[in-house]
Curated annotation (Swiss-Prot):
One of its GO terms (biological process) is base-excision repair. This is Formamidopyrimidine-DNA glycosylase. A zinc finger (FPG-type) spans 241-275. Binds 1 zinc ion per subunit. HAMAP family: Fapy_DNA_glycosyl. Its EC number is 3.2.2.23, 4.2.99.18. Monomer. The active site is at P2 (schiff-base intermediate with dna), E3 (proton donor), K58 (proton donor), R265 (proton donor). Belongs to the FPG family. InterPro entries: DNA_glyclase/AP_lyase_DNA-bd, DNA_glyclase_Znf_dom_DNA_BS, Formamido-pyr_DNA_Glyclase, FPG_cat, MutM-like_N-ter, Ribosomal_uS13-like_H2TH, Znf_DNA_glyclase/AP_lyase, Znf_FPG/IleRS. Signal peptide: none annotated.
């Protein structure tokens, strides 16, 4: 599933082509994704200028004067920028095209767990949308601190890794990035969230930011389907310290990396470096 780095890579790739351009038309070939595509989406966006492209968690927010269209990539979704001249014929899993003057923004999603929604301006600020209102803080915002993590986890017995994945404290820290952040912070993923000290949470907050920044710089992680807006795969996963390295020697101390299952997801850690 595309996580925050993959969505941010997509946003950065799309924004220079989209911002300040008008949507000439929208072709919706699949009306049902995770939720129904708004029946009036094409009408709402026709001839509208895209004012900005933002990201909130794993959601992309495209602002026009009348509101915002919201895109979630789901498990296998991608957004590609394709030149109008010679654009490929839409294939089976190419569900929606936004056509601009010189290019097409194409949404592809083989498993159809993604979503395209419309939030009219008269409904209020897009960040109050039900899908966005309860999200945790952004990891690159000043609000994301070790003190926040420490305060929000007091008395919680859930593991620190599962607390990171929940998304109610901080958004976008998916499975691969949780494992890598905990490795960098030296925290064992099975530790109860409520038992992690403030200094260790401060290290974890720094590790989360550093891990996500590195992933964005490397184009995200391509574990199965993800490609950026230019069709290129990410390569963060090639340099992981822990994730998907079960049985291999730790890059720091040489101890074999262990793999366990937490909440039906694989977790990887070094039993020596992480305490």
């Amino acid at each position: 599933m595309p996580e925050l780095p993959e969505v941010e890579v997509t946003r950065r790739g799309i924004a220079p082509f989209v911002a300040g351009r008008r949507v000439e038309r929208v072709d919706v070939r699949t009306a049902m994704l995770r939720w129904p595509v708004p029946a009036d989406l094409a009408e709402q966006l026709r001839a509208r200028e895209v004012l900005a492209v933002e990201r909130r968690g794993k959601y992309l927010l495209f602002e026009v004067d009348a509101g915002w269209f919201i895109v979630h990539l789901g498990m296998t979704g991608t957004l590609r920028v394709l030149p109008v001249a010679g654009v490929p014929v839409a294939a089976k899993h190419d569900h929606i095209d936004w056509i601009f003057d010189e290019f097409v923004l194409r949404f592809r999603d083989p498993r159809r767990f993604g979503a395209v929604l419309w939030h009219p301006r008269e409904a209020g600020d897009v960040h109050a949308h039900p899908l966005l209102a309860s999200l945790g803080v952004e990891p690159f915002s000043p609000a994301f601190t070790g003190a926040l993590l420490h305060a929000r986890t007091r008395g919680r017995t859930v593991s620190v890794k599962q607390a990171l994945l929940a998304g109610d404290m901080v958004v976008g820290v998916g499975n691969i990035y949780a494992s890598e952040s905990l490795f960098r912070a030296g925290i064992r993923p099975t530790t109860a969230a409520g038992k992690v000290s403030l200094p260790r949470y401060e290290r974890l907050a720094d590790a989360v930011r550093a891990t996500l920044a590195d992933a964005i710089e490397r184009g995200g992680s391509t574990l199965r389907d993800f490609v950026g807006s230019n069709g290129e795969s990410g390569y963060f996963q090639l340099d992981c310290f822990a994730y998907d390295r079960a049985g291999l020697p730790c890059r720091v101390c040489g101890t074999p990396i262990r793999q366990i299952v937490q909440g039906q997801r694989s977790t990887y850690f070094c039993p020596t470096c992480q305490r």
